[in-house]
């Protein structure tokens, strides 16, 4: 159900509270997922004119789970705070003295419900952390992370229910990784989503037993960061080592991700240097180039009255990855009506060369390759 449809069914006096939750409500580490509501119902009599829904189920992303709490207002007394039912978490009994926004409920503040939900989630986090005491190993993992502010202050924990047969229970740690994305070129962060939310990397580590014999890590990137780093398949994190600890493993993943970000930033500056060198060496032979991301360059060149195009595609992780050179005849066509072309990646190249050296080497390679390309164009293409 879309937020707008849900809000149209809410009692008008309660609508500001719910609007703040579903439109602006981001609670916890997963900034890519908003709060949402379902199961709208009314406690009013059937004679009460609508819209009159005053109770609903609130879905809250937390540590890779979705908490489903029932929130119950009274449309007849909209100035009163709501009641809460915590679904399957019957053992969760929040401390009323710590719910300051509930104790001093201010119906004139549209965000008062959202503020109470945030306080409840904080208490729920403490409740889950307390459940780890049943396992000395999992408690050790938690306490060692807690000693490092960069991890301890950005962590959510969900401890699964205890297995009555084995006495075991699972636990999941969700951590917001302290990786700086601010220097990623802005062109890579565009056109992903109208409201992409915060740029964030979350590491989920699931312990399927209390002795950490089955541990499953997974990395989640916000949409813009995933796009900027080359897609979901571009980054593979290492398996959790047998006998390893989170306090050793998490910095490894941070280091891997930081290096990936640096590769992207370095690639952008190196591509710009590369294209600047080609502009200098080839001058009026440059037909067009990508002046934003510096990922493409097209040259129009001539060799013994034979005109041809060279399309240069620079990869995201340039200079580590070699550019592709595509030679294209301006005279010859394939059977499908396309200009005859050949792509080349087997040419002299070193990622250690600067842009000027790459341009000089490319010019030398063009002179050696063009004769055989011209011959192939005449042999395989049609005028």
UniProtKB/Swiss-Prot annotation:
Phosphoserine sites (modified residues): 2
Any GO CC annotation of this UniProt entry: BRISC complex
Keyword Isomerase: no
InterPro entries with a match to the protein in the record: BRE
Pfam families membership: BRE (PF06113)
Region of interest (UEV-like 2), residue spans: 275-364
Positions of region (UEV-like 1): 30-147
Main location: cytoplasm
CDD domains tied to this protein: BRE (cd23664)
Compartment annotation: Cytoplasm; Nucleus
Top-level taxon: Eukaryota
GO MF annotations, alphabetized: polyubiquitin modification-dependent protein binding; tumor necrosis factor receptor binding
BP terms from Gene Ontology: apoptotic process; cell division; cellular response to ionizing radiation; chromatin organization; DNA damage response; double-strand break repair; mitotic G2 DNA damage checkpoint signaling; mitotic G2/M transition checkpoint
N-acetylmethionine: residues carrying this PTM: 1
Reported tissue expression: Expressed in brain, heart, kidney, liver, lung, testis, germinal center B-cells and various mouse cell lines.
Assigned keywords, A-Z: Acetylation, Apoptosis, Cell cycle, Cell division, Chromatin regulator, Cytoplasm, DNA damage, DNA repair, Mitosis, Nucleus, Phosphoprotein, Repeat, Ubl conjugation pathway
Subunit and partners: Component of the ARISC complex, at least composed of UIMC1/RAP80, ABRAXAS1, BRCC3/BRCC36, BABAM2 and BABAM1/NBA1. Component of the BRCA1-A complex, at least composed of BRCA1, BARD1, UIMC1/RAP80, ABRAXAS1, BRCC3/BRCC36, BABAM2 and BABAM1/NBA1. In the BRCA1-A complex, interacts directly with ABRAXAS1, BRCC3/BRCC36 and BABAM1/NBA1. Binds polyubiquitin. Component of the BRISC complex, at least composed of ABRAXAS2, BRCC3/BRCC36, BABAM2 and BABAM1/NBA1. Identified in a complex with SHMT2 and the other subunits of the BRISC complex.
Domain writeup: Contains 2 ubiquitin-conjugating enzyme family-like (UEV-like) regions. These regions lack the critical Cys residues required for ubiquitination but retain the ability to bind ubiquitin.
Functional note: Component of the BRCA1-A complex, a complex that specifically recognizes 'Lys-63'-linked ubiquitinated histones H2A and H2AX at DNA lesions sites, leading to target the BRCA1-BARD1 heterodimer to sites of DNA damage at double-strand breaks (DSBs). The BRCA1-A complex also possesses deubiquitinase activity that specifically removes 'Lys-63'-linked ubiquitin on histones H2A and H2AX.
Protein's name in the database: BRISC and BRCA1-A complex member 2
Origin species: Mus musculus (Mouse)
Gene designation per UniProt: Babam2
């Amino acid at each position: 159900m879309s937020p707008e449809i849900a809000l149209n069914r809410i009692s008008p006096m309660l609508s500001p509270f719910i609007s703040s939750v579903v439109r602006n409500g981001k609670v916890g580490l997963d900034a890519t997922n908003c709060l949402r509501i379902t199961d709208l119902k009314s406690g009013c009599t059937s004679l009460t004119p609508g819209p009159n829904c005053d109770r609903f189920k609130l879905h809250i992303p937390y540590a890779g789970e979705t908490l489903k709490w029932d929130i119950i207002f009274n449309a007849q007394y909209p100035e009163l705070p709501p009641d809460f039912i915590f679904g399957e978490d019957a053992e969760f009994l929040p401390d009323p003295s710590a719910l300051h926004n509930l104790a001093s409920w201010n119906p004139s503040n549209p965000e008062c419900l959202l503020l109470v939900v945030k306080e409840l989630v904080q208490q729920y986090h403490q409740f889950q952390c307390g459940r780890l005491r049943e396992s000395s190993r999992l408690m050790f993992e938690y306490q060692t992370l807690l000693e490092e502010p960069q991890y301890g202050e950005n962590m959510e924990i969900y401890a699964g229910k205890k297995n009555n047969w084995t006495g075991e229970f699972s636990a999941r740690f969700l951590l917001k990784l302290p990786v700086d994305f601010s220097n990623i070129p802005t062109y890579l962060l565009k056109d992903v989503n109208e409201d992409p939310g915060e740029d964030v990397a979350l590491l989920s580590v699931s312990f399927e037993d209390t002795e950490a014999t089955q541990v499953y890590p997974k990395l989640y990137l916000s949409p813009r960061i995933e796009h900027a780093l080359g897609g979901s398949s571009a980054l593979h994190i290492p398996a959790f080592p047998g006998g390893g600890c989170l306090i050793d493993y998490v910095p490894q993943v941070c280091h891997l991700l930081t290096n990936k970000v640096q590769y992207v930033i370095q690639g952008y500056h190196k591509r710009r240097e590369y294209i600047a060198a080609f502009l200098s060496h080839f001058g009026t032979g440059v037909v067009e180039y990508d002046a934003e991301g510096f990922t493409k360059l097209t040259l129009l060149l001539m060799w013994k009255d034979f005109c041809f195009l060279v399309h240069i595609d620079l990869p995201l992780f340039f200079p580590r990855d070699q550019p592709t050179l595509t030679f294209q005849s301006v005279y010859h066509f394939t059977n499908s009506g396309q200009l005859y072309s050949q792509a080349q990646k087997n040419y002299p190249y070193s990622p250690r060369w600067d842009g000027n050296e790459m341009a000089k080497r490319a010019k030398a390679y063009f002179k050696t390759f063009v004769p055989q390309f011209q011959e192939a164009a005449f042999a395989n293409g049609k005028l």
